[in-house]
Swiss-Prot record:
Most abundant protein in the virion. Late-budding domains (L domains) are short sequence motifs essential for viral particle budding. They recruit proteins of the host ESCRT machinery (Endosomal Sorting Complex Required for Transport) or ESCRT-associated proteins. Matrix protein contains one L domain: a PPXY motif which potentially interacts with the WW domain 3 of NEDD4 E3 ubiquitin ligase (Potential). This is Matrix protein. It comes from the Viruses.
Amino acid sequence: MNFLRKIVKNCRDEDTQKPSPVSAPLDDDDLWLPPPEYVPLKELTSKKNMRNFCINGGVKVCSPNGYSFRILRHILKSFDEIYSGNHRMIGLVKVVIGLALSGSPVPEGMNWVYKLRRTFIFQWADSRGPLEGEELEYSQEITWDDDTEFVGLQIRVIAKQCHIQGRIWCINMNPRACQLWSDMSLQTQRSEEDKDSSLLLE
């Protein structure tokens, strides 16, 4: 039993592992309406401090007994304190995590895997955000254990600047993504040039 728990705690994928009856979060698990500052975005009228990124991101959720959306929110509320990546791109990482976890998970052994591969347009306020040409390869495991339940998150985000036409990142179509961004304290402000746009402050 201890050996199995060790495997689970490390979120390892073994070929001999059998799928467990874990359950992904229910669609109606503690959802709420998105905060008002997240608005549908149109084409940006200002090109200042704007970057196109080709994103390859994913979040693997490891839990022997299933998990709820509420637990994922609880874990991510401390994201600022435990983030180990490039802090000039923490806002981008939060956006990718929110969008990935608001998608549909794929079962993989004892894990659930959320993936996101898209090209997005990000715009940062003032002089914030990554340097010109700067890229990100971020990988981190975050665990939560209260002796009765264990949940591990393996987060991986690769962001490379590219010139492919992309989508504006903040699309107000999914309240779960907005909930996760609120939990992670994603900092944005309304663009002065385009009132339908939000700028990242981190």
